[in-house]
A protein has these predicted regions:
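Extracellular carbohydrate recognition
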Residues: 418, 479-496
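Extracellular beta-strand-rich recognition modules
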Residues: 404-412, 470-478, 503
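Loop/turn elements at helix/coil->beta-strand transitions in domains of secreted/extracellular proteins
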Residues: 30-34, 189-194, 292-293, 408, ...
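Active-site-proximal segment of zinc-dependent metalloprotease catalytic domains
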Residues: 1-290, 709
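Short, tryptophan-glycine- and acidic/Ser/Thr-enriched carbohydrate-recognition patches
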Residues: 505-517
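Non-catalytic C-terminal accessory/binding modules of secreted extracellular proteins
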Residues: 46-93, 97-110, 114-117, 144, ...
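Short, surface-exposed tryptophan/glycine-enriched loops
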Residues: 447-472, 476-480
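Extended, low-complexity, turn-rich repeat/linker tracts enriched in Gly/Pro/Ser/Thr and Asp/Glu
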Residues: 401-403, 411-420, 481-484, 539
Length: 709
């Protein structure tokens, strides 16, 4: 930990944050994964929202062999067998390109995975029944049916006793500390790490023959509302039961039949707790940031050797130092702005006697929070904002005999159909004038409030069923792991006209995440520069061979041209005031974004003389600082070439200068010609007077000396 007051417990793997609340800091050793292969049947399912139609199948081994004269992107094997996945995922033999070896290298031999792969199990329904994007998102809750159906079909091949004996080794970890004892090293009834592989191509690469009916690769939790077909699950945590066994699947990842090491490692990174670092709106044609090929958790999952026969995604780039730090896998130094320090940096890809990275601690960032004025008085109640919240406020309230009319004023901006607020009585959700029971994504726990209001609006609820009783009245705010909106606000809470919540004084409410606020606050956040010496070593050889551009989409939709990312010192800005890297929502800012050492924007030439920009993952290729000139390249846009010239080395990073721009001669962000906007590239750093100088590099570039001031 760089700073904080957490208290280590035991062997320091677990840290107690507050009494009765513990978190696991780092992972050591090896985790088992259960991988179930599932292929599709021919029937069309009729779900609660109707049939999605679609073609029969596919079965496995039906992906057409690509013509390598026109397709250098598709991964293909003549037989996607159990043995193929056992090698791809779990081989630890030296020199084998596998997910296990990838994680050995990322963790500097601290961590890896092993696992079992099942035979292909055929589910009843076709791919469209599980993968159609009916919900308006690229991932819909019907994928939970596929997880359920595929594990049940596989379970039919074993007796219940055989299932239980086999599955016991996959449940040794209590991920969510269900009993609150701080002991994570105990079974909890759920498979610790579950991986589903579906026949056919993934939706993220176009879906192949299935197109929009193909399942997108993702990590999620099946029926986390505990409302699935198999019941509430162990401890009420939801999930699906594996046959008639004692074990359930809750957390899962899902990947396609022809997924490479990259997509499997990326999704498993989510299972370890890492977020997406690309702009997630880009999945559906939105924005793109400049993390590009610099990290597995962005386009780096699509690294490769550059050989047409391998396709793309076979050899991912490394995680960045921020991700390795989150997992406890980084050897690092700490520097502070305004203090001179010298650091010898080894390559980020391996552990040497030198540090793999440096964290430069900056002055705390002050961010104003303007939620708007209270409905009445000087304060109101606020849920807070963020991912994975389960915030509450509760109070003992007497409901008068013959009464029970609750009124309140509410104002909210909640991620529609994904996040919800609730009115609760004795812990149960109750109906209000703002609540709904619709549940398109499986995240409404019942009578949820979602979407947004236009200012303060009245809310009513009938609590007459509790008349004459004293109850625990409460509000709850529950969010998923993405797209945190401002949240839920409530004021002037009354029962039968008697005020029970004005937020003006201590009225007996107990807060767990909720708080009172005037609506205007100033919050401070930690922020850092994260330095890493990126070299063409190990899986980062793909920085030299793997970055690509679809330069001929008008004639060759599945052909890419390759170029290299520049090795050297990568400076990332880690800003904890953000929870994501969605620069389309907040240009120039994000959770952790690379500083572009050569920030002059690159434009396509030829037929796009209107100033159309190259996409940020191309702009970011020369982001590193160092002693060498950048490489020159020629890239294409619909076959029209553009020459990118070599630029002088950038030896010094100084945050007193700007490495980000919101406009160029052709327009500003939001009004610039073309899809990609100026403000999406690089990051707007704070002016703290910090500088980082690359003083020297070894003759082979493996080590560098840097000075921080």
């Amino acid at each position: 930990m760089l700073a904080g007051k957490a208290r280590p417990v035991g062997d320091n793997r677990v840290v107690a944050i507050n009494k009765g609340q513990s978190v696991e800091l780092r992972r050591e050793g090896e985790d088992p994964i259960l991988t179930v292969l599932g292929e599709f049947g021919d029937e069309r399912a009729v779900h609660r929202h109707g049939s999605h139609g679609g073609a029969p199948g596919p079965r496995h081994n039906q992906i057409p062999e690509p013509d390598r004269r026109v397709d250098n992107t598709t991964i293909w094997e003549p037989d996607f067998s159990e043995a193929y996945y056992e090698k791809l995922l779990y081989s630890q033999k030296s020199g084998v390109n596998s997910m296990a070896n990838y994680y050995i290298e990322q963790s500097s031999n601290r961590y890896s995975v092993n696992g079992d792969v099942t035979p292909w199990a055929k589910v009843r329904y076709n791919a469209a029944s599980y993968g159609a994007d009916y919900c308006g998102s690229i991932v819909c809750a019907d994928t939970w049916y596929f997880v359920d159906d595929s594990v049940d079909e596989w379970a039919k091949t074993l007796t219940t006793a055989e299932l239980n004996a086999h599955l016991a080794k996959f449940d040794v970890w209590d991920r969510y500390d269900y009993d609150g004892d701080g002991n994570f090293d105990e079974p909890d009834g759920y498979i610790d790490h579950f991986q589903s592989v579906h026949a056919g191509e993934g939706g993220e690469t176009g879906g192949g023959a299935q197109g929009s009916d193909a399942i997108w690769s993702h990590r999620w939790y099946a029926y986390f509302s505990a409302n699935g077909p198999d019941g509430a699950g162990p401890h009420g945590f939801g999930g699906v039961r594996i046959g008639n066994s004692d074990y359930w699947v809750g957390d899962y990842t899902i990947e396609p039949e022809n997924g490479g090491v990259g997509v499997f490692a990326h999704e498993f990174g989510h299972d370890l707790g890492l977020p997406d670092l690309y702009d997630t709106s880009g999945n559906t044609g939105g924005a793109e940031n400049s993390t590009g090929f610099w990290t597995l958790m962005s386009s780096g999952s699509y690294g490769s050797s550059g050989r047409p026969v391998d396709g793309i995604g076979t050899k991912p780039m490394h995680m960045g130092n921020w991700e390795k730090f989150q997992l406890g896998w980084l050897k690092y130094d700490v520097a502070r702005t305004g203090e001179h320090s010298a650091h010898r940096l080894g390559p980020a890809e391996v552990t040497t006697k030198a540090a793999q990275g440096v964290f430069v601690v900056l002055p705390r960032k002050v961010v104003p929070l303007d939620l708007g004025a209270p409905y009445a008085g000087e304060k109101f109640y606020y849920s807070g904002s963020g991912d994975n919240l389960n915030n509450t406020m509760t109070k003992q309230v007497a409901i008068p005999a013959g009464g029970g009319a609750l009124t309140a004023q509410v104002r909210y901006d909640i991620e529609e159909d994904w996040d919800y607020a609730y009115l609760t009585v004795n812990g149960e959700h109750v109906q209000t004038s703002h609540s709904t029971d619709t549940n398109p994504n499986g995240t409404n726990l019942g009578e949820g409030i979602t979407g947004s209001t236009d200012g303060w609006e009245p809310l009513t609820a009938d609590l007459s069923a509790y008349a004459g009783r004293t109850v625990t009245l409460g509000w709850r705010y529950n969010t998923d792991g993405a797209e945190a909106e401002p949240g839920f606000m409530v004021d002037a809470i009354a029962v039968d006209g008697t005020m029970v919540g004005t937020a003006e004084a201590d009225e007996g409410w107990t807060f767990d995440g909720f708080r009172t606020t005037t609506g205007s606050e100033q919050t401070t956040f930690a922020n850092y520069y994260v330095l890493e010496n990126r070299q063409y070593r190990g899986y980062d050889e793909s920085l030299q061979t793997g970055p690509y551009n679809f330069g001929f989409l008008n004639t060759l939709q599945n052909w890419v041209e390759h170029f290299s990312y520049q090795d050297g010192l990568l400076v990332n800005y880690w800003d904890t005031s953000y929870s994501d890297n969605n620069v389309g929502d907040h240009p120039g800012g994000g959770l952790v974004l690379p500083v572009d050492a050569h920030p002059k924007l690159l434009h396509w030439e030829g037929g796009t003389a209107d100033g159309t920009l190259m996409r940020p993952r191309i702009q970011s290729y020369d982001s590193t600082f160092g002693l060498e000139r950048t490489e020159a390249y020629t890239l294409h846009n619909n076959g029209v070439p553009t020459r990118i010239p070599s630029l002088p080395a950038a030896r010094v990073f100084e945050d007193s200068r700007s490495y980000w721009q919101d406009c160029d001669a052709h327009g500003c962000t939001g009004a610039h010609p073309g899809r990609h906007q100026p403000g999406w590239n690089s990051v707007d750093v704070p002016n703290t007077g910090t500088s980082v100088r690359v003083v020297s590099e070894s003759n082979k570039g493996s080590f560098m000396n840097v000075h921080v001031n």
